[in-house]
């Protein structure tokens, strides 16, 4: 089951996406569909077919966001989180081979588009890291076996 938590930044991005889709993009595509429909035969009208499909995709996303945003719990930074890994943390980890990774633990719906360096709170890596501290060793189950990582740093975006 997906966790229904989101960072303030993630919530604002999804709200902005919903506003854009509903107020700007959908009306634009609706106009194109109307124009293409006015040309007559719709069976071989590529503009009509393409824009109608695009309109369905927009409507699907708008329905999802309209339902999701009121139900989601926004998780803001709290000073009690300092020093431990919790939701919203930026975590840098390293394995014995010297491979270093840095990512932020966020809700599953925040991982889209240009969201680089984010992992879902529902992922095995995030689950293994929760409540750990700097210099702790973490064992993460993977398809190829258990992987060991060491926590180098934990940071939070405090300006949320």
From Swiss-Prot:
Keyword Transcription regulation: yes
Record GO terms (molecular function): DNA binding; RNA polymerase binding
InterPro entries reported in the protein's UniProt record: GreA/GreB_C_sf, TF_GreA/GreB_CS, Tscrpt_elong_fac_GreA/B, Tscrpt_elong_fac_GreA/B_C, Tscrpt_elong_fac_GreA/B_fam, Tscrpt_elong_fac_GreA/B_N, Tscrpt_elong_fac_GreA/B_N_sf, Tscrpt_elong_fac_GreB
Superkingdom, taxonomy of origin: Bacteria
Keywords: DNA-binding, Transcription, Transcription regulation
PROSITE patterns, sorted: GREAB_1, GREAB_2
Pfam family, one: GreA_GreB
Any one GO BP annotation for this protein: DNA-templated transcription elongation
Biological role: Necessary for efficient RNA polymerase transcription elongation past template-encoded arresting sites. The arresting sites in DNA have the property of trapping a certain fraction of elongating RNA polymerases that pass through, resulting in locked ternary complexes. Cleavage of the nascent transcript by cleavage factors such as GreA or GreB allows the resumption of elongation from the new 3'terminus. GreB releases sequences of up to 9 nucleotides in length.
Family to which the UniProt record says this protein belongs: Belongs to the GreA/GreB family. GreB subfamily.
The protein's name in its UniProt record: Transcription elongation factor GreB
Gene expressing this chain: greB
């Amino acid at each position: 089951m997906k966790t229904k938590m989101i960072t303030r930044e993630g919530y604002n991005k999804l709200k902005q996406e919903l506003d854009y889709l509903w107020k700007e993009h959908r009306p634009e595509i609706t106009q194109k569909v109307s124009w293409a429909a006015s040309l007559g035969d719709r069976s071989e009208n590529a503009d009509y077919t393409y824009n109608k499909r695009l309109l369905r995709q927009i409507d699907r996303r708008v329905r999802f966001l309209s339902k999701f945003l009121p139900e989601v719990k926004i998780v803001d930074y709290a000073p009690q989180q300092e020093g431990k890994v919790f939701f919203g943390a930026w975590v840098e980890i390293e394995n014995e081979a010297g491979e270093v990774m840095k990512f932020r633990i966020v809700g599953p719906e925040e991982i889209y588009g240009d969201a680089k360096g984010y992992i879902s709170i529902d992922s095995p890596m995030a689950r293994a890291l929760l409540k750990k501290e700097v210099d702790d060793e973490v064992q993460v189950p993977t398809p190829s076996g258990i992987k060991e990582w060491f926590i180098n740093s934990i940071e939070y975006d405090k300006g949320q």
